[in-house]
Amino acid sequence: MDITQLILDDHHEQRRLFAILEQIDRSDTGTLSAVWARLGSFLELHAAAEEAIFYPALLQVGIAARRRSGVEEETLDAIGDHNDIRDAVAEAARHPVGSDGWYAAVAGANLANGDHMAEEEREGLTDFRRLAGLQQRHSLAVAFAAFEARNFAGVEPVDKDPGAYVSQAEAGTPSVGDGSLNIGGLK
């Protein structure tokens, strides 16, 4: 098991759920609502798991490999992307399911999420596979899977300040109330 593969698996599921939404009749608001509730919750759970497990580890291995600026930029961008996705999900909640405003907000979430996943797959996951050993990737995969399992009912969406997040992660100090398992130091 490898954390980068678990993240890719989650990305596939996110793409699949967005595609399902696109194929549901606009008037079937009950089904749209059910699929969107699952997807919105999953987007937040995935972001929280990455923020608790993956990004602190990416910063640590990047700093150890003397690639601090690269991994800091990737992490700052990712946390900002997670905030954009949260904001789009919150915007969708302000509109009746199936309305033009709801569809626009869902499209915004899909765009923000798609851009984030593409960058993460091209940069963060690639860097992590190059910099972290297989045992560390396995240990983090176990922690990532456990985080998602423990929080399957959802986590509270909270925007994070990207700069403060990076500073705390580099210092090994978890954010208060971030749902972290405090295992960012796994080697």
Where are these regions (language model features)?
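Small-residue-biased structural context
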Residues: 1-187
